[in-house]
Amino acid sequence: MNLQENSSQQLKRTMKSRHLFMISLGGVIGTGLFLSTGYTLHQAGPGGTILAYVIGGLMMYLVMQCLGELSVAMPVTGSFQKYATTFIGPSTGFMVGIMYWINWVVTVGSEFTASGILMQRWFPDSSVWMWSAIFAALLFICNAFSVKLFAETEFWFSSVKIVTIILFIILGGAAMFGLISLNGTADAPMLSNFTDHGGLFPNGFLAVFIAMISVSFAFSGTELIGVTAGESANPQKDIPRSIRNVAWRTVIFFIGAVFILSGLISWKDAGVIESPFVAVFAEIGIPYAADIMNFVILTALLSVANSGLYASTRMMWSLANENMISSRFKKVTSKGIPLNALMISMAVSCLSLVSSIVAPGTVYVVMVAIAGFAGVVVWMSIALSQLLFRKRFLKKGGDVKDLTFRTPLYPLMPIAALLLCSASCIGLAFDPNQRIALFCGVPCIILCYLIYHFKRNVTKAKKISQEEYPADHIL
């Protein structure tokens, strides 16, 4: 492919509203919902689990409202990395971009490994490595061929997950209240699992607090819609609509599914169930429930990997476009694909995959810890960028009425987002299982700042040019 670097050869604006919506949902709905919810339910109880998801959803909603104002005013690829560069400082923009890139390349490698393991259910004698390589090659082709192919692939991947969740909520709710009979059960559970076995908070509020920390990270991925802003065909119209839809639908899907799970499965049994979704579908009497959910979870894994590969590639392109890393990574093909950035992102994802086998207790643990911590750091940067953007916008004589998308209740909403995200970070220190994210993430942030300041005399980061977005008078 012919790679070009001239200013006129930028990324292509070909994504439609439905693509933006599904890509954002695809990044957030993964195995955490389908597999890990049982563990959270066992840990925090039914009331604690729902409360944890409500607070996590609230945090996500606050951040998305901040991102909406920024993305509509400045619809550029790289999104929050460029916003952090312009409104917080170039060193913070560099840190945010690197942390977000690490987050996704590690995640993509993990998804490939998990996908290979799932395939062994149907092909027990096959190799995990073989399936991982096949899926990696397929997703690389989807991302390398054209933005439209990637977007369409992600649209259908995400559709499978969303249909499954909707069916689960409808059928599970019907079974919970006696409209559908459960196998081997005379009476519908109704709300008994919320009142029996210790009630809503059987393990106390400390368990709820710890669950809140882990669940708050489960919503990371919705910010992907900001990364797509620079390739949206009509950002002024599509981004506001997509952000509003993603925010409330994600909350409904997550909390609705968790409510049904909590009503149908006792919190005492939830910790030993491999997949609570399989258990519920099997109890309802859905034939081949395990195989169906194996396919859905496989689709979820590939969807997250697909979105993650896209996000890491665009973030690397954005860093190169800001003169923060080698200019080789901002070269694009004639179809607007940053192929060099795609290849290096895929290569590092594969190294992450290898480290999960070769050094699972050392290198891989550290990488996963940093990746998990990166999500909340990015959210904090979005909230702070919006706070500073609005302040500068008003100082330069801007009128809030001129903003197509306005963050409500400014400055309370971005401040609340910052406080909740900060609480999540601090809370990591109180959970022995998640403390490593804090211990590895903070040094990585410091290292990013040191690297940037070491290199700043060699390359200078550029602010978003006035041609790239309509709010040019705030600079």
From Swiss-Prot:
Instruction: Note whether NAD occurs among the keywords.
Output: no
Q: Do you know which InterPro entries this protein is assigned to? A: AA-permease/SLC12A_dom (IPR004841), Amino_acid_permease_CS (IPR004840)
Q: Does the keyword Transmembrane apply?
A: yes
Primary location recorded for the protein, binned into one broad class: membrane
| Residues annotated as transmembrane | 20-40, 44-64, 87-107, 127-147, 162-182, 199-219, 246-266, 277-297, 341-361, 363-383, 410-430, 434-454
**Where found, per UniProt?**
Cell membrane
What are the UniProt keywords, alphabetically?
A: Amino-acid transport, Cell membrane, Membrane, Transmembrane, Transmembrane helix, Transport
The GO annotation for biological process reads: amino acid transmembrane transport
Question: Which GO terms label this protein's molecular function in UniProt?
Answer: amino acid transmembrane transporter activity
| Membrane topology (UniProt) | Multi-pass membrane protein
Cellular component GO terms, alphabetically? membrane; plasma membrane
User: What PANTHER family is this protein classified in?
Assistant: GABA PERMEASE, GAMMA-AMINOBUTYRIC ACID PERMEASE
**Family the entry assigns:** Belongs to the amino acid-polyamine-organocation (APC) superfamily.
Question: What is the name attached to this protein's record?
Answer: Putative histidine permease
